[in-house]
Amino acid sequence: MSLLTPDSGLLFWMVIVFGIVFVILAKYGFPVITRMVDERKQYIDKSLLAAREANEQLANIKADSEMILAKAHEEQARILNEAVATRERILKEAKTQAQVEGQKLLDEAKKQIQAEKDSAISDIRRQVAVLSVDIAEKVLRKNLDDEKEQMEMIDRLLDELTVSKD
């Protein structure tokens, strides 16, 4: 039981050694330990402050990015609307121009057809006139021998002329 109840000499030396160790620690160890704890506390405080600032910057950056995205979406919508309007305008202009060109071609074709028709009619009239003169000449040679036949022919031609004019 000597370990559980130490002698007074042992107790004296233990107190002395403890006191010396305590004084040495108090003079050299505790200031270093408290300084390190204070430095660690300052480092943690600085880190917390930096983290808080980083979170604020992140929130600001996030708000800025959302604002930029909103502007980009607005710009995209504006550009798309302009593109649609431009496309519609171009299509309308092209359609109008195509109608104008089509009408122009149609008018030219009508003029050309009318000119060809007039040319064909005048050509046919000329041919009919030539044929009529040839036929009349042959008929007249044959029929003009008799005066009675001449009068009948003149009457018939006059009747045909009045009927064709009506």
UniProtKB/Swiss-Prot annotation:
Domain of life: Bacteria
Molecular function via GO: proton-transporting ATP synthase activity, rotational mechanism; proton-transporting ATPase activity, rotational mechanism
Pfam families (alphabetical): ATP-synt_B
Localization per record: Cell inner membrane
Transmembrane segments: 10-30
Keywords, sorted A to Z: ATP synthesis, Cell inner membrane, Cell membrane, CF(0), Hydrogen ion transport, Ion transport, Membrane, Transmembrane, Transmembrane helix, Transport
GO cellular component, one term: plasma membrane
Membrane topology summary: Single-pass membrane protein
Subunit structure: F-type ATPases have 2 components, F(1) - the catalytic core - and F(0) - the membrane proton channel. F(1) has five subunits: alpha(3), beta(3), gamma(1), delta(1), epsilon(1). F(0) has three main subunits: a(1), b(2) and c(10-14). The alpha and beta chains form an alternating ring which encloses part of the gamma chain. F(1) is attached to F(0) by a central stalk formed by the gamma and epsilon chains, while a peripheral stalk is formed by the delta and b chains.
NCBIfam families found in the cross-reference section: ATP_synt_b
Role description: F(1)F(0) ATP synthase produces ATP from ADP in the presence of a proton or sodium gradient. F-type ATPases consist of two structural domains, F(1) containing the extramembraneous catalytic core and F(0) containing the membrane proton channel, linked together by a central stalk and a peripheral stalk. During catalysis, ATP synthesis in the catalytic domain of F(1) is coupled via a rotary mechanism of the central stalk subunits to proton translocation. Component of the F(0) channel, it forms part of the peripheral stalk, linking F(1) to F(0).
HAMAP family hit by this protein: ATP_synth_b_bprime (MF_01398)
Family: Belongs to the ATPase B chain family.
The protein's name: ATP synthase subunit b
Gene behind the chain: atpF
